[in-house]
């Protein structure tokens, strides 16, 4: 891992680290969203659907902004706490983030997902559970810092998904995009779309 993958926050304390969602994950999910939704306005026009294609375009843009906002998550670790934050332009009702002082961390518990994966939750002394972000660049470094701050053994904690999984998904997404583009261009050349 290169040192420029994890940004240090010079304006805060010397030891604060910022971990962002991996660019591979961000690009893959944004491309998948565009690829899956791009045909909808064209299909609405061809099938004479009761929903105008303009409304679909508007909904797609709103959805894209919402997805991008969710993918702007940042995990900040400093001497006092772990924090999950979002940029100021993201409304708090949509994604409000959380913070947990290191002194309040009681344990790190594993849970199985519906798909058979493993996720981890911080348990606070008050019984609240906070999801450990697992799709960040520098995950291993982040987990080492969590272990150093809490004393909880994190040697068995691994990322939820590996980069090759997102590379495969990105490859299939690009293939689907090519099929979408071919279908839309063919429909336009046949005069089915205006």
Model feature map: region roles:
Residues 178-194:
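Juxtamembrane boundary at the C-terminal end of a transmembrane helix
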Residues 84-144:
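Non-transmembrane, membrane-adjacent beta-strand/coil modules in membrane-associated proteins
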Residues 41, 45, 58, 73, ...:
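Short N-terminal micro-motifs specific to bacterial/archaeal maturation
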Residues 60-101:
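Conserved beta-hairpin
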Residues 26-28, 45-60, 194:
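Hydrophobic alpha-helical transmembrane segments
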Residues 9-11, 74-75, 121-123:
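Short, exposed beta-strand/loop patches in secreted or surface proteins that constitute
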Residues 2-6, 68-74, 103-107:
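Short small/polar-residue motifs
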Residues 1-47, 127-128, 135, 141-148, ...:
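N-terminal membrane-targeting/pre-transmembrane regions
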């Amino acid at each position: 891992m290169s040192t420029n993958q994890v940004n240090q926050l010079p304006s805060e304390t010397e030891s604060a680290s910022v971990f962002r969602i991996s660019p591979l994950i961000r690009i893959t999910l944004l491309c998948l969203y565009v690829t899956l939704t791009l045909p909808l306005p064209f299909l609405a026009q061809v099938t004479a659907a009761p929903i105008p294609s303009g409304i679909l375009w508007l909904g797609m843009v709103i959805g894209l902004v919402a997805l991008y906002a969710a993918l702007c998550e940042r995990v900040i670790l400093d001497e006092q706490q772990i924090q999950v934050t979002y940029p100021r332009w993201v409304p708090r009702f949509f994604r409000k983030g959380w913070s947990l002082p290191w002194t309040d961390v009681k344990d790190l518990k594993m849970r199985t997902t519906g798909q058979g994966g493993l996720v981890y939750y911080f348990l606070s002394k008050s019984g609240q559970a906070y999801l450990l972000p697992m799709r960040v660049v520098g995950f291993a470094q982040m987990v080492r810092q969590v272990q150093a701050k809490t004393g909880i053994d994190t040697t068995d904690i691994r990322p939820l998904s590996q980069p090759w999984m997102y590379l495969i998904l990105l490859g299939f997404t690009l293939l689907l995009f090519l099929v979408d583009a071919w279908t839309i261009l063919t429909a336009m050349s046949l005069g089915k779309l205006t």
